[in-house]
Amino acid sequence: MTKTTKTMNPKFYLVLALTAVLASNAYGAVVDIDGNAMFHESYYVLPVIRGRGGGLTLAGRGGQPCPYDIVQESSEVDEGIPVKFSNWRLKVAFVPESQNLNIETDVGATICIQSTYWRVGEFDHERKQYFVVAGPKPEGFGQDSLKSFFKIEKSGEDAYKFVFCPRTCDSGNPKCSDVGIFIDELGVRRLALSDKPFLVMFKKANVTEVSSKTM
């Protein structure tokens, strides 16, 4: 008695391959300045437009050292502190465009002894702004953690922007806001929700650079 072995139809594998390609094309990978797809590594966030500050770092507000806000270096030659991206729902290894994800400033230690995940803070009534601040690691998808989700979206041919879409449990289509730059009374360039986006590009950081960063 001869056993027959079932073989998969080649069309089945073709469908699987096409499905994977379509998924990656629907949500393209964010790429760095070398044109490489970005993954779970550290990257500097740099301005596309030169002469208006450098990379991103951490700073207090109103002359106080703590807690931290996310700010832009004043000098364009200073790349700041790299960031890491995580927690996107799409089942892909690369950092996807237009998907909610978490952003963490990748610093070894801080004098404020606090986590450095990005989140949108409470409304600053004095400055009439919603600033992007450093906060705790988001836990799950609860109401408070939703303040820590941002999207990276293409803006033109060679630039990206950060977008905040505050989806709540009872919201349909959330109203999205771009993340821009607000220059405060001390001249500090702070990330804040804005109708004028801060256009950026990403540069991969090496391990030595990341391990040496402290605040």
Swiss-Prot record:
Residues 1-28 form the signal peptide. Disruption phenotype: Enhanced lesion development after infiltration of leaf tissue with the programmed cell death (PCD)-eliciting fungal toxin fumonisin B1 (FB1) or the avirulent bacterial pathogen P.syringae pv. tomato DC3000 carrying avrB (Pst avrB). Enhanced resistance to the virulent pathogen E.carotovora subsp. carotovora SCC1. One of its GO terms (cellular component) is endoplasmic reticulum. One of its GO terms (biological process) is response to insect. Induction: Down-regulated after root-knot nematode infection. Accumulates locally within 72 hours after P.brassicae butterflies oviposition. Induced late in response to bacterial and fungal elicitors (e.g. Pst DC3000 and Ecc culture filtrates), and upon wounding, salicylic acid (SA) and hydrogen peroxide H(2)O(2) treatments. Induced by infestation with spider mites. Gene3D superfamilies: 2.80.10.50. Disulfide bonds join C66-C112, C165-C176. It comes from the Eukaryota. SUPFAM superfamilies: STI-like. Exhibits Kunitz trypsin protease inhibitor activity. Involved in modulating programmed cell death (PCD) in plant-pathogen interactions. Can inhibit both serine proteases and cysteine proteases. May be involved in the modulation of the proteases that participate in the hydrolysis of dietary proteins in the gut of spider mites. This is Kunitz trypsin inhibitor 4. The lineage of its organism: Eukaryota, Viridiplantae, Streptophyta, Embryophyta, Tracheophyta.
